[in-house]
Amino acid sequence: MNTIKDLRTAAGMTQKAFSEYFGIPKRTIENWEGGQRECPTYLFELMKYKLEKEGLI
């Protein structure tokens, strides 16, 4: 998994559910997935870690 969209779809979440789960505005998720902005690497790794620990991916 190399992108936010990969993480989100692996967890079976919509953009809305993913944004609510992490407390990140939905528009930010849309911008990351659409390529308008880049998710910071440290944040991507933290989100991946949390999803793995929660057993969602």
Provide a role label for each language-model segment:
Residues 1-9, 45:
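A short, Lys/Arg-rich alpha-helix, primarily the initiator
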Residues 9-12, 40:
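Residues within alpha-helical segments
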Residues 12-30:
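Short alpha-helical DNA-recognition segment
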